[in-house]
Amino acid sequence: MRKTNMWFLERLRGSGENGASRGEAGDKSSKGPLYSNVLTPDKIPDFFIPPKLPSGPTEAEGQADLGPSTSEQNLASPGPRRAPRSPRLPAKLASESRSLLKAATRHVIQIESAEDWTAEEATNADPQAQGAMSLPSVPKAQTSYGFATLAESPHTRRKESLFHSEHGALAQVGSPGAGRRRAGAKGNGGDGGSREVGGALMSPSRYFSGGESDTGSSAESSPFGSPLLSRSVSLLKGFAQDSQAKVSQLKQSVGRHGSLSADDSTPDTSPGVRRRLSRRATPEPGPESGQAPRGEHTVKMGTRGSVRLLAEYEAAQARLRVRLLAAEGLYDRPCDARSINCCVGLCLVPGKLQKQRSTIIKNSRHPIFNEDFFFDGLGPASVRKLALRIKVVNKGSSLKRDTLLGEEELPLTSLLPFL
């Protein structure tokens, strides 16, 4: 009885193990198609590396000499093979192999033999070294790799270079103050300074020739000695015209400084002395000097402040010009600055002729105008009879009325004392 039970248990155990193995195999077979995109050793495609070709034959000859590739042989062989994972794989492999063959036959580099080159030519074969060897006047240097190169740049040591120190003369000529200082430093008036500046400006060879180079370069190495620059003549003409204009301005300034008397031409060149000399040389304006008579006046506007203005009369054009400068003391300190809208009106009386009004200046207790007012058609007789009325008003905002700050009438003869 015990043997029968043991046999039955062994049969049950064996049937259970067989069923489990069959279930695992079924699961694997059912899960197989789900993971078909996983790359396994049996799914790796064949790769093709094109061979090195000794020469560049034509495409047909190259394909005939090389023969079919390994992948093409595998595709063409009728023997047993694995089923392809994709129906497009054979056509894709064939097209890739053909494109690789075409690329291999097309890109062929011809290399010359190394025995044809000498040691010096092989060292200085690059364009930079060849350019350095073509300039015999510029000093050479050798790099750590044995290549020949220039010890310094051939452009920054020439007279025509913008970085050269002598080109500071152009900057000094461009500023009138520098020209006056250089002219005043000369002991013999201003002729020496003007001749020096004129020579520096009017001799284009100082800037357009390589003969005066510090490195002693020849005409062949100079960039301006090349016949390719056929437009340099027009450049020279324009340069000469600008130079003549600058020289004439410099001569005029030098002549003004040289025309001073012996007692005025002191070595003191401070700004205060120059202002005193100009004030002494300037004549008083009047009818005999040919200048328009003018004068600045401060007009009191009653008890509230004043207005500063400048009057000038041009007899040749019969025109009176009044420049309104500023107004002062018209507003008290407690007044709100946001309500200030100052405006000045001008006219000629009697008759209120040629009424004019200034710009409204806001938010300022001391407004500054600096405006010009012109009164035309005034002969000398009319100027002696008419007067100028000045009316200062604070313009009201929104519904507020204008506020009169001051009004005054001045005869034109008091504004123009030279009439």
Swiss-Prot record:
Region feature Disordered, mapped onto this chain: 1-96, 115-136, 151-225, 247-300
Location of Phosphoserine modifications: 259, 261, 270
UniProt-listed PROSITE patterns: C2 (PS50004)
GO cellular component: cytosol
Protein origin, superkingdom: Eukaryota
Start-end of Polar residues biased regions: 212-225
InterPro entries per UniProt: C2_dom, C2_domain_sf, C2C4C/C2C4D
PANTHER family: C2 CALCIUM-DEPENDENT DOMAIN-CONTAINING PROTEIN 4C (PTHR46291:SF5), C2 DOMAIN-CONTAINING PROTEIN (PTHR46291)
The protein's name: C2 calcium-dependent domain-containing protein 4C
Species for this entry: Mus musculus
